[in-house]
Amino acid sequence: MPRRYGMVEAFAVASGKGGTGKTTSTLALGMALAERYDVTVIDADTGMANLLFHTGLDDADVTLHDLLVAERDVPVAEAVYDRFGMSVVPCGTSLAAFEAADPGRLRDVVAELAADADVLLLDSPAALGSKSAVLPVVLADRVVVVLQPTVPSLSDGLKVQEYARSYGTETAGVLFNRVRPDEDVEAISEQAARYFGGTTLASVPESDAVRAARRAGEPLLAHAPRDPAADAFHEAASNLDVRSGDAADVADRFRSAVVPDRP
């Protein structure tokens, strides 16, 4: 996909707690958006990395962890892999690497990646309990909040939005995921419309194909492109209003972003 020269927007894909299917959603949105944009997906969940298992990168030689350790001085390009029409930056799973990583270095990494992308998707940690967890939300232009259609999930998502807004990051939209047939999405959607800044992007049904895709080491849209869940993710990508930002300005903002100690 030829990129729109010099234009970029960064989205954090976030949720209040684990289990919402955030990584599945990040990659599905990425593949759908890659039909129109040059997309880079970054696994910014440095403590509980998961994206590498969804993209067949279990044995990746270089990951985001390597870029976040100053002593290693690894070029950013070495951690970027072409997968499923996207550029993917996985994160490793080593506890030692996580402890050695400096989350603040993520600013420079994202700034460099912004030069070669129209859309950056930051797969963010599910909880906001540390500096490494909150930084992706702080860096992003806007956040996509992934929820399940329950009141507790809605409450958790609102906490993410409240924190994001405290750093000037607005909500791009809400994505309801893993929706079962017996769940009343409409009622929860009405509440979400009242409390969240962005629109409801789509309602994605629970699907066995998602688990099968994970076992195969593939994103859902590659493994089962005609599954109803895949269709819903395409709908979400279509409803996501991607805005134009000057790549140089965005990179400067990333590099100068305030690094919070914790929420």
Language model features with spans:
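Walker A/P-loop phosphate-binding motif and the immediately C-terminal alpha-helix
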Residues: 2-46
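P-loop/Walker-type NTP enzyme "switch/lid" segment
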Residues: 15, 44-115, 215, 219
